[in-house]
Amino acid sequence: MGPPLGAGVSCRGGCGSSRLLAWCFLLALSPQAPGSRGAEAVWTAYLNVSWRVPHTGVNRTVWELSEEGVYGQDSPLEPVAGVLVPPDGPGALNACNPHTNFTVPTVWGSTVQVSWLALIQRGGGCTFADKIHLAYERGASGAVIFNFPGTRNEVIPMSHPGAGDIVAIMIGNLKGTKILQSIQRGIQVTMVIEVGKKHGPWVNHYSIFFVSVSFFIITAATVGYFIFYSARRLRNARAQSRKQRQLKADAKKAIGRLQLRTLKQGDREIGPDGDSCAVCIELYKPNDLVRILTCNHIFHKTCVDPWLLEHRTCPMCKCDILKALGIEVDVEDGSVSLQVPVSNEISNSASSHEEDNRSETASSGYASVQGADEPPLEEHVQSTNENLQLVNHEANSVAVDVIPHVDNPTFEEDETPHQETAVREIKS
């Protein structure tokens, strides 16, 4: 009948700290007894276990020192030592029966009982306080309670209110079962319990699970919202960039279709009553290259072109050059559709002559900047009719209204009815 030497040899040295860390983790994950105070700090217990092994008539002591126990929450924090004694009878290991007895060894040669510790198994339908109180009534100096079968070396901080008269600790099931089997083989096992280290506060596995799930949900929601927000901003930025590029490209095309004019000596814009460029606030000079917008306002080419690229509107009247030239931009997807009337050439021809006509009465800011030579109105009507005949040959039925562009409604009153040319339906 040999002693359980394997455990004693393997636990010597520095294995106690690593086991303690593992037990601390298991303690946090293990369920607590009803009424336990999981938020309180927990004290571990150093255990010095020794076996008196009879061998060929000679007693030999084998010991092991480890930090494998946990003090109960209502237990006195003090050291205690004694011989481990289980309850009598194989079915009484839980010590839930109030008539449970313990067979305590006596000092050799006398009837005086030695100092002893009750070795009790957890469970059986009674509380920790019932087990510890029974051990105290039977004269034990302390109670060592080992965990359920199947829990290996997991331990929990016991709560046993009303049973704080003696030291009470809990050890793992594997540890307690090994000691119990040694006692049942007739080996006397002695345990010295010393106060270990303070750990805490402790939480049970339900708290850890709740905190973990909550943290995961919050983190996932935060990351998901950040990804969604970033993707949305990136998509909007790309769409805006595409739109701006498209608008700039259309603005370049529109600027290329606007008329340019080089001012000469004798032009109204250079005379004593001449106006200045609204962008750079400088007077016009001979040989200045000016841009004529669709609203008949003129500006220096170098001044107004950068403005038109960014804003696409007249700096003075906010007239949109894209719309004035028949370019419509779809704001939703940035697509651009060109809508040029059939009578575009006719309208341009008519409007150019009418702008020359209005330049006599309008101010330099709102006046036309066409050349001084104006063809008679009869020639304008004749050329218009020729263009309409050309359109009539290319289409069976075309209805075109040629309406001159008016930059300001106040000038419309000065126009005579015969300056509008309306072409009705022509059938071949």
From Swiss-Prot:
Gene3D superfamilies: 3.50.30.30, Zinc/RING finger domain, C3HC4 (zinc finger) (3.30.40.10). Residues 1-38 form the signal peptide. GO terms for cellular component: cytoskeleton; endomembrane system; membrane; perinuclear region of cytoplasm. The chain crosses the membrane at residues 208-228. Residues 346-428 are annotated as: Disordered. One of its GO terms (biological process) is protein ubiquitination. It catalyses: S-ubiquitinyl-[E2 ubiquitin-conjugating enzyme]-L-cysteine + [acceptor protein]-L-lysine = [E2 ubiquitin-conjugating enzyme]-L-cysteine + N(6)-ubiquitinyl-[acceptor protein]-L-lysine. The keyword Zinc applies. InterPro entries: PA_dom_sf, PA_domain, Znf_RING, Znf_RING/FYVE/PHD, ZNRF3_Arkadia_E3_ligases. It is a single-pass membrane protein. This is E3 ubiquitin-protein ligase RNF128. It comes from Pongo abelii (Sumatran orangutan).
